Every structure is written in C-alpha cells, then in structure tokens.
Design a protein with these regions (language model features):
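Alpha-helix boundary/N-cap detector
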Residues: 60, 64, 68, 135-142
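Exposed beta-strand-loop-beta-strand "reactive/processing" segments of non-cytosolic proteins
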Residues: 12-49
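Residues that cap or initiate secondary-structure elements
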Residues: 39-41, 53, 98-100, 131-133
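Short, non-transmembrane alpha-helical segments in secretory-pathway proteins
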Residues: 1-17, 69-82, 144-145
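Non-cytosolic head/periplasmic domains of membrane-anchored proteins
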Residues: 62-126
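Extracytoplasmic/periplasmic C-terminal soluble domains
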Residues: 106-164
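A short, surface-exposed beta-strand/turn
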Residues: 43-66
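Short glycine-rich, low-complexity/disordered patches
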Residues: 7, 11-22, 82-99, 155-163
Length: 164
C-alpha cells in the first residue's frame, strides 16, 4: 500500500497496520488501512483493497478537498458572526466513489467541476452552533440558509447536518 501511494502521489506516507473485514467462507473481504503523509498527521485517510482485486482505492484526494472546503466555508460562516450572539463551526466531508477515487488528484484545477458532477463525490456539510443563549432560532435558520446558498450557488450537490 505504501508503494501504491508513493507512485500515485509522489510523496511518502505512513501506513498503519491493515485489517481484513467482512471475510468468510465464500465471501470476499476488504482490506482497509489508515494512512497519512509523513509531513501531515492531520491528514489521515482510508485505503481499501477488495480481496482478489489487483487495485487499491483511497480517499487522500477527498481528505485534501474536505480540508480546503472546510476552510473556505468557515470563512463564509464567520462573515456575520461578529454581529451575532452565536458561534458556528463548519466541517465538510467529501467521499469519492470510483472512478473518481482512482483518478482525481488533490491539485486538480477543476475541483469544483468534479464536485458538481452527477456521479461525483458525496459532499456532507456539518454546521455546529454554539453559545445560543438569547438567540432566535429564526436568526440561526437564516444563517444556515446563507451558508447553504453559498454552496448551492456553485451548483454543488450536498447534504447539510446542523447541530444546535
């Protein structure tokens, strides 16, 4: 798995101990392992390999894109927070399915185009609101709509989970 990552991304990775799941008599299992670049322990992602297949699939590109989108949306979320009575934290989790997981690279200049595709990635947005004392829920709903609109204006298909 280390060789696969090194060849695909031209950098070194720390690969943890692999584990086999869902294997049994007559059932192909899936090998899974967590890995991260040597230069960044905060960028842990999953690699999988189905038994009896020669190819691997990983979520490194999805992890990089998730971190970038989280930073971008947190900036949008914080635009009106100075005038608000609450704090909001945004986190984005992108999951790439095949064939994107196999072909997309972190520095792809057309990330937004890839995310917009019908067969593109799963794009989940979590909004966590804190310090809600003396706050109107109507104001919070307006804030959620503002953040959601900034995403959908880019034609990105997503699901939003809100934690109050």
């Amino acid at each position: 798995m280390s060789n696969y990552l090194r060849k695909k991304y031209n950098q070194e990775f720390v690969v943890e101990e692999p584990s086999l799941s869902a294997a049994g008599l007559g059932v192909e299992g899936t090998w899974g392992v967590d890995a991260h670049p040597v230069s960044s322990k905060d960028t842990t992602f999953r690699i999988i390999k189905v038994e009896n297949r020669n190819s691997f699939s990983d979520q490194y590109t999805a992890k990089i894109w998730s971190q970038r989108e989280t930073a971008r949306l947190n900036k949008i979320a914080q635009q009106n927070v100075a005038n608000s009575k609450w704090n909001v934290k945004v986190s984005v989790e992108i999951y790439l399915v095949e064939p994107l997981a196999d072909t997309a690279l972190p520095d792809n200049p057309k990330v937004e185009e890839i995310i917009r595709q019908d067969y593109g990635p799963v794009y989940n947005v979590n909004l966590s609101y804190f310090e809600l004392q003396n706050t109107s829920y109507d104001d919070i709903v307006c804030d959620m709509e503002r953040i959601a609109n900034s995403i959908t204006n880019n034609s990105i298909k997503m699901s939003i989970i809100t934690i109050l």
